[in-house]
């Protein structure tokens, strides 16, 4: 599973790298900064969409029901553990803030 994760991460970074190389914009005046912000938001959104599409394609290509079941089981166990530890941490912080009575 580790190699699949690394492969997916590599492909996402590769897609983002090619997108960044192709997005050379000429310099604009400072009065056009709202347009620059809009362009940056649009380019970040397109990068995110392309990364999601690449990850989805990779997931669909390498889909295995047993791996999917194991991932779902790991997710449910880890979220249960994290909620337990978050509750303990919250209690500790509240007791420190409240002080001894």
Swiss-Prot record:
Belongs to the apolipoprotein C2 family. Residues 78-101 are annotated as: Lipoprotein lipase cofactor. Transmembrane segments: none annotated. The keyword Chaperone does not apply. InterPro entries: Apo-CII (IPR008019), ApoC-II_dom_sf (IPR023121). Residues 66-74 are annotated as: Lipid binding. GO terms for cellular component: chylomicron; high-density lipoprotein particle; low-density lipoprotein particle; very-low-density lipoprotein particle. This is Apolipoprotein C-II. It is found in: Secreted. Keywords: Chylomicron, Glycoprotein, HDL, LDL, Lipid degradation, Lipid metabolism, Lipid transport, Secreted, Sialic acid, Signal, Transport, VLDL. It comes from the Eukaryota. GO terms for biological process: lipid catabolic process; lipid transport; positive regulation of phospholipid catabolic process. GO terms for molecular function: phospholipase activator activity; phospholipase binding. Component of chylomicrons, very low-density lipoproteins (VLDL), low-density lipoproteins (LDL), and high-density lipoproteins (HDL) in plasma. Plays an important role in lipoprotein metabolism as an activator of lipoprotein lipase. Both proapolipoprotein C-II and apolipoprotein C-II can activate lipoprotein lipase. Proapolipoprotein C-II is synthesized as a sialic acid containing glycoprotein which is subsequently desialylated prior to its proteolytic processing. Residues 1-22 form the signal peptide.
């Amino acid at each position: 599973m580790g190699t699949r994760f690394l492969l997916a991460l590599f492909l996402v970074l590769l897609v983002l790298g090619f997108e960044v190389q192709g997005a050379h914009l000429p310099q604009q005046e400072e009065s056009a900064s709202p347009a620059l912000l809009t362009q940056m938001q649009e380019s970040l959104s397109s990068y995110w969409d392309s990364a999601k599409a690449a990850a989805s394609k990779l997931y669909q290509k390498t889909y295995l029901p047993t791996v999917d079941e194991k991932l779902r089981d790991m997710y449910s166990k880890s979220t249960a553990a994290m909620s337990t530890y978050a509750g303990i941490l919250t209690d500790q912080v509240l007791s420190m803030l409240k002080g001894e009575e």
